[in-house]
């Protein structure tokens, strides 16, 4: 009786499987919801979904979409990158001279001896040497006149209204990458006007970033209420972020956070020259023509955006 029951069950299974196979075969020949003709799939073509306008933003402290990384990671250069041919991926220097080992500090800021108790580490300090001789792609933001004044940090309405591509301006300049550019980029994460998606998590790791963000936001409100120009983020320090000299970047984070080396490979930590934000803020009419950092990045990478 037990064998007969198993046999009957097997028959039902085979019958059901045959029905499914027939239906599947029919479905493969004529898909119900196929968005493209079958002939399109005969070629070696990659199809991908596309939603909205892409790229939406190329601001390195804001961009967080995979559709934008092909631009941001070839135009901008964080301190570190990855060796993608190694398994597992290895963090390697990009604009940094080397991948550094952090110095661990106690709650009083004193350096701990090697092999000290992990629980005694209140802070980790990364002192990153930046390579010399790296320069920004030519851009009108850096252009100066014979007297050394920036040519395009003040634009008339007549010029700004007609400008749709900043590279159409006749004069361009460049300068060397410095550690201050990385400090400026990190401060932009804390600037509420930037609306960086990583401010929340990084403010809990980078010493002083939360306090900077709150202090600067208050300064913006006070300036607006008094009818004064917006303050400059360069005038507001972040306790744990500083340039020791022109080519040495120092970042201090809370506790031991080895994943911070991976953060330093991301475009959020790309350098931004203050001249770029000064240029794009030279006249409000530029934003109407989409002449902004979101659309026209200024970086040190091997590529630049052109039209």
Model regions: which residues?
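Aromatic- and charge-enriched surface segment that lines or borders ligand/interaction sites
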Residues: 98-205, 250
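Bacterial N-terminal signal peptides that target proteins for export
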Residues: 3-15
């Amino acid at each position: 009786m037990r064998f007969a029951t198993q046999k009957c069950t097997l028959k039902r299974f085979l019958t059901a499987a045959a029905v499914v196979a027939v239906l599947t075969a029919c479905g493969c020949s004529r898909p119900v919801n196929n968005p493209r003709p079958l002939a399109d799939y005969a070629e070696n073509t990659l199809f991908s979904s596309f939603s909205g306008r892409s790229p939406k933003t190329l601001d390195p402290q804001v961009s967080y979409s995979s559709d934008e990384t092909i631009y941001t990671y070839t135009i901008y250069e964080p301190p570190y990158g990855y060796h993608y041919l190694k398994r597992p991926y290895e963090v390697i220097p990009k604009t940094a001279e080397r991948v550094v080992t952090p110095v661990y500090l106690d709650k009083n800021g004193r350096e701990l001896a090697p092999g000290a108790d992990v629980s005694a580490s209140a802070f980790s300090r990364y002192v990153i040497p930046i390579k010399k001789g790296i320069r920004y792609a030519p851009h009108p933001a850096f252009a100066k006149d014979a007297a050394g004044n920036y040519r395009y940090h003040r634009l008339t309405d007549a010029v700004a209204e007609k400008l749709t591509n900043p590279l159409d301006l006749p004069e361009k300049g460049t300068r060397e990458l410095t550690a201050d550019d990385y400090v400026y980029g990190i401060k932009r994460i804390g600037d509420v006007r930037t609306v960086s998606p990583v401010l929340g998590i990084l403010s809990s790791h980078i010493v002083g970033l939360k306090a900077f963000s709150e202090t600067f936001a208050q300064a913006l409100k006070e300036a607006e209420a008094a009818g004064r120009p917006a303050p400059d983020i360069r005038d507001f320090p972040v306790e744990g972020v500083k340039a020791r000299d022109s080519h040495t970047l120092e970042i201090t984070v809370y506790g031991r956070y080895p994943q911070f080396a991976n953060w330093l490979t991301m475009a959020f930590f790309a350098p931004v020259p203050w001249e770029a934000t000064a240029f794009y803020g030279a006249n409000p009419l530029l934003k109407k023509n989409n002449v902004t950092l979101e659309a026209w990045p200024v970086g040190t990478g091997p590529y630049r955006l052109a039209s």
